[in-house]
């Protein structure tokens, strides 16, 4: 619409110019509108600036100016668009070339990757379907699963019971760790015992005594070892009273008891310690403190010259006399040691450890001190 109005005005001005001689066409210097970079070398022709323009003249001048501006604007826009289009074509061409070069050889790899992904997807779907079928089957058979689980648990219980049985058999049949021999007391008899001959005198102001015991039968008083003199047959005693352990120093009135610590048919490691200065007395069972007391036989000194025996108590001075069948031990003894000092807690634990029978006392040392069996007692391995 705007273009039609411009054309109409242009035709109308041409008709008026032909029929009228009164109007002189005036050309206006447009250098002030658009600077084309050309500057005149001569002075411009002076115009009749003082002449008044009619309304039509002003209209024509405005039309000419607007047409020129429009043509120049269209030309500039066309130039800009052409340049931009050319630049875009060049960039697209370069991009196409760069993409074409690496993609051409990579097409087979891309095809292989696509195929592998398809296979993986299919395998995943198949696995999901199989899992769903398994879950469905498992949901349909809860009772069967429960029975299978119960059978496994029962088998585990039986295995545990078998293991306990084997451990019990080993405890009954084997010697303690590190011990190669033991003395067997086959029955209770006043003739069955073992006589011990210390390597040093038994004059003691403190001592520690340890022994491994496996009893087959226990009464109210079953002697493990006993040391006594003619004056006092009960200087030192360690004996069993059913499942309890009794430790005596200086007489039967001085005793320490550890309740319910022994099981028949099983090896048990026992230690007793005592010192005269404080009367501190302790009983240890399998490396653990079972009982302790103070002021027991304080100031007492164990005299030398007595008789030391295992498996029996001698309450007389003469050979062959003073034995009591009810006091006799039946079972096995090993690892009997006596020290003339109080062992530390760690040392006591070591005497019942893997090398227990290789740790020897300085008064009585198992394996080096003479221990003579009597009346049917014998060394076994």
Swiss-Prot record:
Q: Which InterPro entries match?
A: ConA-like_dom_sf (IPR013320), LamG-like (IPR006558), Pentaxin_CS (IPR030476), Pentraxin-related (IPR001759), PTX3 (IPR042837)
Q: What induces it?
A: By IL1B/interleukin-1 beta and TNF.
> What start and end residues bound the annotated signal peptide?
1-17
Q: Is Mitochondrion there in the keyword field? A: no
Instruction: Please provide, in alphabetical order, the Gene Ontology terms of the cellular component aspect for this entry.
Output: extracellular matrix; extracellular region; extracellular space; specific granule lumen; tertiary granule lumen
**Compartments reported by the entry:** Secreted
**Domain annotation Pentraxin (PTX): ranges:** 179-381
What does the protein in this record do?
Answer: Plays a role in the regulation of innate resistance to pathogens, inflammatory reactions, possibly clearance of self-components and female fertility.
- Tell me, how does this one assemble? Homooctamer; disulfide-linked. Binds to C1q. (Microbial infection) Interacts with SARS coronavirus-2/SARS-CoV-2 Nucleoprotein and Spike protein homotrimer.
Instruction: State the protein's name.
Output: Pentraxin-related protein PTX3
Q: Which organism is it from?
A: Homo sapiens
Q: Which gene encodes it?
A: PTX3
């Amino acid at each position: 619409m705007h273009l039609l109005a411009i054309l109409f005005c242009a035709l109308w001005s041409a008709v008026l110019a032909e029929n009228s001689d009164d109007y002189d066409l005036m050309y206006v210097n447009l250098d002030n509108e658009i600077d084309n970079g050309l500057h005149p070398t001569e002075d411009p022709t002076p115009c009749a600036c003082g002449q008044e323009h009619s309304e039509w003249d002003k209209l024509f001048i405005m039309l000419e100016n607007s047409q020129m501006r429009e043509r120049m604007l269209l030309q500039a826009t066309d130039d800009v668009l052409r340049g931009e289009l050319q630049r875009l074509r060049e960039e697209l061409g370069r991009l196409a070339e760069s993409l074409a070069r690496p993609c051409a050889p990579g097409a087979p790899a891309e095809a292989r990757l696509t195929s592998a992904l398809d296979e993986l997807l299919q395998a995943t779907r198949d696995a999901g379907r199989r899992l769903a079928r398994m879950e469905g089957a498992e949901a349909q058979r809860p009772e069967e699963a429960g029975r299978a689980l119960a059978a496994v648990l029962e088998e585990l219980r039986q295995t545990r019971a078998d293991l306990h049985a084997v451990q019990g058999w080993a405890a009954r049949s084997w010697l303690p760790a590190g011990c190669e021999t033991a003395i067997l007391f086959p029955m209770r008899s006043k003739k069955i015992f073992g006589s011990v001959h210390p390597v040093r005198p038994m004059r003691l102001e403190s001592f520690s005594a340890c022994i491994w015991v496996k009893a087959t039968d226990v009464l109210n008083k079953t002697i493990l070892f006993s040391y006594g003199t003619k004056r006092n047959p009960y200087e030192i005693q360690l004996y069993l009273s059913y499942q309890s352990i009794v430790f005596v120093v200086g007489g039967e009135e001085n005793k320490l008891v550890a309740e319910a610590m022994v099981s028949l048919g099983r090896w048990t490691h026992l230690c007793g310690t005592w010192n005269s200065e404080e009367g501190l007395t302790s009983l240890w069972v399998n490396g653990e403190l079972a009982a302790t007391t103070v002021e027991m036989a304080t100031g007492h000194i164990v005299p030398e010259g007595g008789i030391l025996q295992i498996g029996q108590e001698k309450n007389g001075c003469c050979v062959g006399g003073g034995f009591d069948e009810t006091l006799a031990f039946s079972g096995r003894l090993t690892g009997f040691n006596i020290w003339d000092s109080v062992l530390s807690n760690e040392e006591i634990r070591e005497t019942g450890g893997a090398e227990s029978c290789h740790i020897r006392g300085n008064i009585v040392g198992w394996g080096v001190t003479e221990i003579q069996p009597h009346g049917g007692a014998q060394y076994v391995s």
